[in-house]
């Protein structure tokens, strides 16, 4: 079953369970007056879409959630075309400069942790790859040269290697290339790219020789068709992210809120609702909720309208949950 169909069923189940257990899903207090415009990361999309659906069902108003990749989302955000930008990496220095030039101020809010997941077809014999083997598959020098699995490592099968991955506007592309190749956006180009992670899922599900990488939630929704590959002997999971073993492919994900948009009551209500329910909904759609302390700090930053980013235009690789908390507390 496709991810989107699973997500719709899942959200219905979330509402039922939350109602039964008395979780924080109380109706938003008043009807919104305008549409909340959101765009950006496909990785963060499932969380934000889950929030938007609940928010609308509880009378908060309408929020539209688009997908154009983290980089594509920031382009719109810094032009003032969206109220909130989903991001699977921190905002970069060039994007900060673009926002500043357009007079767009923003508040940075971490919402969850992701285990960026490398997947293969369930019929593929590969169960573990090293970061060095991944680099040999994906580095620019591999283009036109590494077309079989055993060309990346002699221990792998003599079979065609077909690669799927996010496009260059994706924050996942930025993060993966930095973590695996050693330089952001440094990648071979002879692979099948898409900003729609469901396209990547379909590609691998139909081809026993394919490999792809994307956010953990998309793997979790398709475990009957895909197999996660252990990286340096460690499989992605909530546990291996929390104990810092799944490195370097674990990372925080964010939303960025236009400070001017927060003056609109419906945007303020939506953002408050998001932060009050991010832990529950991020876990429900397949990501790893942050510690309660992280959400408390984020809510304080939101309440105080703390403008800017704790990352100073950099996108660090392998940032632990503890390191994220330290940055947030010192900001």
Q: Which role does the model predict for each range below?
A:
Residues 18-27:
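C-terminal segment of classical bacterial N-terminal signal peptides
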Residues 1-2, 21-22, 44:
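Extended interaction regions within the primary functional domain
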Residues 26-331:
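Flexible loop/hinge segments at secondary-structure junctions
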Residues 2-14:
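Bacterial N-terminal signal peptides that target proteins for export
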């Amino acid at each position: 079953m496709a991810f989107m169909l699973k997500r719709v069923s899942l959200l219905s189940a979330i509402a039922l369970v939350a109602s039964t257990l008395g979780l924080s899903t109380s109706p938003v207090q008043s009807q919104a007056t305008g549409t909340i415009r959101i765009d950006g990361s496909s990785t963060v999309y499932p969380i934000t879409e889950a929030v938007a659906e609940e928010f609308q069902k509880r009378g908060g108003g309408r929020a539209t959630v688009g997908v154009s990749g983290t980089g594509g989302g920031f382009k719109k955000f810094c032009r003032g075309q969206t109220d909130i930008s989903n991001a699977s990496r921190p905002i970069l220095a060039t994007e900060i400069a673009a926002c500043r030039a357009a007079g767009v101020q923003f508040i940075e809010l971490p919402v969850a942790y992701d285990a960026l997941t490398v997947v293969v077809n369930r019929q593929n014999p590969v169960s573990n790859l090293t970061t060095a083997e991944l680099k040999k598959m994906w580095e620019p020098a591999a283009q036109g040269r590494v077309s079989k699995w055993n060309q990346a490592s002699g221990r792998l099968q003599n079979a065609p290697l077909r690669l799927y991955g996010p496009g260059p506007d994706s924050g996942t592309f930025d993060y993966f290339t930095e973590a695996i190749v050693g330089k952001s956006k440094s990648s071979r180009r002879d692979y099948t790219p898409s900003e729609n992670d469901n396209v990547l899922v379909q590609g691998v599900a139909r081809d026993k020789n394919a490999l792809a990488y994307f956010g953990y939630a998309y793997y979790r929704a398709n475990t009957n068709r895909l197999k996660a590959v252990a990286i340096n002997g460690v499989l992605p999971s909530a546990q291996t992210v929390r104990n810092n073993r799944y490195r370097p492919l674990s990372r925080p994900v964010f939303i960025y809120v236009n400070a001017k948009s927060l003056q609109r009551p419906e945007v303020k209500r939506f953002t408050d609702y998001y932060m009050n329910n991010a832990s529950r909904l991020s876990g429900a759609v397949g990501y790893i909720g942050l510690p309660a302390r992280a959400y408390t700090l984020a809510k304080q930053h939101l309440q105080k309208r703390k403008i800017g980013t704790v990352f100073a235009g950099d996108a660090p690789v392998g940032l632990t949950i503890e390191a994220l908390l330290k940055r947030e507390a010192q900001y």
